[in-house]
Amino acid sequence: TLIIKNYQFALYYGASSIKKYDTLYNYALPFLKRKRYKVLQGQNSNFTHKGNFSRYAIDFKMNVGQTVCAIRDGVVIQVKDKFTEGGRDKSYRDKANLIIIYHEDGTFAQYVHLKKDGVLVKKGDSVKKHQPIGYSGNTGMSTQPHLHFAVYKPSENGLVSIPFILNSIPTEKYKKGKYAKNK
């Protein structure tokens, strides 16, 4: 964000004109096969998954250092890998290590709270579905080690989280306390 003489401008990724995207695409779980992780927070939940940006996000409880994988083929457009700390306070909101990947249908996936030096890809890299891209952590606004991830489409007001199908299961089925297993 750039502020000039009381005017504020913001730059967002993607084409805000995107109307259709592949709503039936079956995304892979963001972790290795034969692993299972507990859902800490599902869509539209009280703590941080409210509003347009995070409504359909899912948090998986993952100890620091667990392998995070791409949920779909795409191109890495943003990486943050320098932060070491995390906490509940909003002052940590912009201090999360993350990866954002662009998909061919105009959507994006965001993988957040990665550990410092835990990113295996760089901006501009092409990635394949199931490819390891980083390691889970506890950076940014986070109360415990986990992976926060969501799928987005661009809008005139920035990225908006969208419902999606993950491992043949719609996002609304990923409820707090349930487990997701990657077979």
What are the residue ranges of the model-derived segments?
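A structural signal for short beta-strand/turn segments enriched in small hydrophobics and glycine
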Residues: 68, 74-76, 121-136
